[in-house]
Structures are given as C-alpha cells and as structure tokens.
Swiss-Prot record:
UniProt name for this protein: D-xylonolactone lactonase
EC number: 3.1.1.110
GO biological-process terms attached to the record: L-ascorbic acid biosynthetic process
Record's keyword terms, sorted: Hydrolase, Iron, Metal-binding
MF-aspect GO terms: calcium ion binding; gluconolactonase activity
Gene name per UniProt: xylC
Positions annotated as active site in the UniProt record: D195
Organism of origin: Caulobacter vibrioides (strain ATCC 19089 / CIP 103742 / CB 15)
Family of the protein in this entry: Belongs to the SMP-30/CGR1 family.
Cofactor note (record): Binds 1 Fe(2+) per subunit.
Cofactor section: Fe(2+)
Residue sites binding D-xylono-1,5-lactone per the record: R98, N100, E119, N145
Kinase found in the keyword field: no
InterPro entries reported in the protein's UniProt record: 6-blade_b-propeller_TolB-like (IPR011042), SGL (IPR013658), SMP-30 (IPR005511)
EC class: hydrolase
C-alpha cells in the first residue's frame, strides 16, 4: 500500500509507545525517557509531562479527567495538573517486571500485560482489571503486547513479541478468556517482530512491526492483506484518531538502533500519521466506580 505518511512529531523517542486518541488529541508515552506526550493535530500544539518512573500506557477514565497509567511500580492514576497516585501494585518488585501494553474493552475493563524489564525471561502475565479487582488471565509471556478486542467483543488478541506470535482468544461477556490459539505466527528466521496492535471497525487487525519499517493489516482469518511502510525501523504501536477515526497514528523507537542506522533513518523515534479508508473503533474508557 502506497500511503501518505506524515511525521507529525519528530520527537526522537527512545521507546515511543501506547498511543491513544482522547479529547480530539493524541496521547502517548516514551517509556525509557519517562515522559507522557500530548499532540493536538488541530493546532499543532505539543505538551509533555514527566513521570516518576518508566511509564508504559495511558487509558482514559469514565466520568473523570485524567488517565489510568502503567508505571514500573504498578497501576497509577494520572492527571496533568495533580500528578500521579498509586491505584495498585501488580507484582513483586523482585521479579523486575513492569507493565507494558494495554487496552480497554467496551465494558470498561482494563487489559494489560507485564514483562521482564530486561527482556530476559518469560515472567510476564496478562491481567484484567475491573470493578471486582485484578485477575491474571495468561502467564509465562516474554514481552506482552498488542491486547485488543474485535468490534463484536467476542475475540481478544494478545501478542508475545519475542515468540513472534499473535494469539486469539474467545472473550465471554463476563470477561473470561478461552480457546487460546495462534492467530498469526511470524517467521522465526528474521529480525521482524509483531509489536502493538489495534482492531479497526471491520474487525481487521493492524500490527506494528518492530524491525519491519511499518505495519500490516490482518484479516479476521489471519491473512496479511495490506502493508504500510514507514521511514523508521522500529514501529511500536498504531492507534486510530482524527474526527472520523480514519487516521492511523504510529509511535516508533530509536532503542537498539546503531548510529549508522539512526543517520540513515533520522525520523526514527517520531510519531507518524497515515490516512486510511476504514475507520477505527472509538477509544473506550476505564470504569473505576
């Protein structure tokens, strides 16, 4: 697919991640720089906020301002004016795990994964947080990534990046997962890894490619049908934005790139916008009460 690609913020993020569309603006993080960023497409304004630790995702809250965010120390509440407050600690600090990617389903449940911060073992898990508490839904994961839900709410997707595998699950109305199966298995002999994902309004999965200079759109059957090329090697996650949800925004990363590669791809670590024909799903909000 020959796409119109625009770098909307040449941020040079070390590890740009977690983009969401909220309040007609784009929010995302730089995990390693401990930053939360906010881009206003209508005006071009940009704002940045410091986090006290590695910050990995944001999710808006039903009936409230601010966000639920993942920090290395656990799940926190964040407001730009008042800062951070701890909601819950997820795992024992001795594991050296941290939250990674997250999504919110139509019922307001927060789904998030944890991973070993050094990317050295499979100590990560997948969790679901709702009004009843936090439940572990899957475990023994190397790098948790790409949680997202189909438009009908019946299929849940989740990726283990180091295993190069996107999994699908049946998702019940009560939030239980079953029938775990391989949705897409990436080739094991190269350096392209599936990273974050998002599902569009037709039920097709857009997956960012770490080491792959772009993203791929997969059909509900797992067939690759479209590819977008970006001028950055490590693409981390897409999200839909714009007034009609027909703009795909992508975060990227400079992490792991040599000086030679960075000189060849100076926009690595930037945020990119690409118009698409099929709209995304609205950003859901976390239900805390």
């Amino acid at each position: 697919m020959t796409a119109q690609v625009t770098c909307v913020w040449d941020l040079k993020a070390t590890l740009g991640e977690g983009p969401i569309w909220h309040g007609d603006t784009l929010w995302f993080v730089d995990i390693k720089q401990r930053k939360i960023h906010n881009y206003h497409p209508a005006t071009g304004e940009r704002f940045s906020f410091d986090a006290p630790d590695q910050v990995t995702f944001l999710a808006p809250i039903v009936g409230a301002t601010g966000f639920v965010v993942g920090l290395k120390t656990g799940i926190h509440r964040f407001h730009p004016a008042t800062g951070f407050s701890l909601l819950l600690e997820v795992e024992d600090a001795a594991l050296n795990n941290r939250p990674n990617d997250a999504t919110v389903d139509a019922q307001g449940r927060l789904w998030f994964g944890t991973m070993h911060d050094g990317e050295e073992n499979n100590s990560g898990s997948l969790y679901r947080m709702d009004l009843t508490g936090v439940a572990r839904m899957d475990r023994d994961i190397c790098i948790t990534n790409g949680p997202c839900v189909s438009p009908d709410g019946k299929t849940f997707y989740h990726t283990d990046t180091l295993e190069k595998t996107i999994y699908a699950f049946d998702l019940a109305e009560d939030g239980l997962l079953s029938n775990k199966r391989v949705f897409v298995q990436f080739a094991l002999g190269d350096d392209v890894y599936p990273d974050g994902s998002v599902v569009d309004s037709e039920g097709y999965l857009w997956t960012a490619l770490w080491g792959g200079f772009g993203a791929v759109r997969f059909s509900p059957q797992g067939d690759a049908v479209t590819r977008i090329e970006l001028p950055a090697p490590n693409v981390t996650k897409p999200c839909f934005g714009g007034p009609d949800l027909k703009t795909l925004y992508f975060t990227t990363a400079r992490k792991g790139l040599s000086d030679e590669t960075l000189a060849q791809y100076p926009l690595a670590g930037g945020v990119f916008a690409v118009p698409v024909d099929v709209a995304g799903q609205p950003q859901h909000e976390v239900r805390l009460v």
